[in-house]
A protein has these predicted regions:
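Nucleotide/phosphate-binding catalytic cleft detector across ATP-hydrolyzing
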Residues: 1-55, 77-88, 110-204
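Secondary-structure boundary elements
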Residues: 18, 25-28, 50-51, 60-61, ...
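Gly/Thr-rich phosphate-binding beta-strand-loop-beta motif of the actin/hexokinase/Hsp70
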Residues: 47-76, 94
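Glycine-rich phosphate-binding loop plus the immediately following alpha-helix
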Residues: 70-111
């Protein structure tokens, strides 16, 4: 883990000035200092001082699910993990399973419309199948977390980022100790907060 951090720091320090364009605007960024931390840790960084118990922070990303264990406001690196289950893999699996069950090739954007509760032209029965398949995957993820030693019945759980939408809408049961922070910019805001703290600036 420490070796990976050092490699990332060295990589991002190769060039300290980055020039790029985004949506028609030109930008020039000067890198003053490189900070490395788990992605979903940044999403809750501004709240750590108020977390006076055990928490599991779960960030379902595009390719991996990052999990940070927090005890009394401090991340416990030895109990923080990355799981190779996430949205890209799940969507492809759902497309494959829909092909098997219906004989139809369902485009990725139509699958996402159903999962995000947007208007879709898919038959209702197809939409129900897709939602059921996502419920199975969220359940499978939580089973794996339980198998890795996290007690999902009592520990405080916070799902963060875009994947929190999937967990909230497909978890299948209400739990008073589970929260969903569906802010798509949660990690970016957290990185800004952390950088500000380390540079001695007030952010927020």
């Amino acid at each position: 883990m420490e070796g990976d951090k050092l490699k990332l720091i060295d990589y991002y320090n190769i060039e300290n000035v980055l020039d790029f364009s985004y949506e028609g605007e030109d930008y020039s960024v000067t890198i003053v200092k490189v900070i490395v931390c788990p992605q979903c840790y940044s999403a809750i960084a501004s709240r750590l001082s108020n977390m006076r118990d055990d928490y599991l922070i779960v960030d379902i990303g595009s390719k991996t699910t990052d999990v940070v264990y927090v005890r009394n406001g401090f991340p416990v690196e030895s109990r923080s993990i990355t799981i190779e289950k996430a949205m890209v893999k799940w969507i492809k699996e759902i497309q494959r399973d829909m092909k098997v069950q219906t004989g139809k090739d369902i485009p990725e954007h139509e699958v996402m419309k159903v999962l995000l509760k947007e208007e879709s032209n898919l038959p209702v029965v197809y939409a129900e199948l897709i939602r059921g398949m996502m419920r199975e995957r969220i359940h499978s993820l939580e089973l794996e977390l339980a198998e890795r030693g996290y007690d999902m019945e009592y520990i405080n759980i916070i799902y963060v980022g875009g994947g929190a939408l999937m967990a909230r809408d497909h978890a299948g049961k209400y739990r008073s100790h589970t929260a969903y922070d569906c802010d798509l910019c949660a990690n970016a805001k957290g990185y800004e907060f952390l950088a500000g703290q380390m540079m001695g600036k007030k952010v927020g």
